[in-house]
């Protein structure tokens, strides 16, 4: 389920992002449009994505998703519509790869957080997921690859 859990330091990034707060059962309705909106604005402003898109979950809440849909970019973007610019600082994180359908992410996060705790590490309240292989690449959910990142205190 989880591949290669380890601790690493991320690089600082410029991002274009759309903040989203939605009930958990509506995530499938809002995720795609949010990412499409970010990519459209990035391209409209003549910027280029410089890596996979990701979601920065600001907090974990059983009732809602409170996150930012982010695209790393080569140059800053101007705020337009719901899209805002952001800086993603270099951060020490615990990281692992989950391979499988998105429906298994909750269980994967549980196993990953248990690994983090077993290492004597303390995670912050936020977390993020980078989508390395998803529905834009294959219709086979067992082939999806999601990078799990737990920023550390």
Where are these regions (language model features)?
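A solvent-exposed interaction/effector surface
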Residues: 1-153
